[in-house]
């Protein structure tokens, strides 16, 4: 029952990872959208380490101190720290990241080396040549 109460009142998040969408735009381009309502760009960190995309919220110590001074009757909107991580192939390159209306969008593409890209081979048509001997 305590667990149910804490979920209903929002005292503990159901998940520390934010919701996200991953969309394939075409053969080589993708977009990752992460729901981060209430976060400013200064409070978010996006990095790639060892082919792992990491998205983290950064703690704000000053705001935590200010929050402690408030006498909450009910606090249903929480802004908890989170960390979400995705393993990337070495061929994935990030184009950009932007934050708009509480959604962090990352655009990335599959950078296939030229030697791995499909190549069309043209077919020549040979004409029959008759030899007159």
Swiss-Prot record:
Domain of life, per lineage: Bacteria
Keywords, in A-Z order: Plasmid, Stress response
sHSP domain ranges (all copies): 11-126
Protein family (similarity comment): Belongs to the small heat shock protein (HSP20) family.
PANTHER family attached to this UniProt entry: PTHR47062, SMALL HEAT SHOCK PROTEIN IBPA
Protein name: Small heat shock protein ibp
Source species of the chain: Wigglesworthia glossinidia brevipalpis
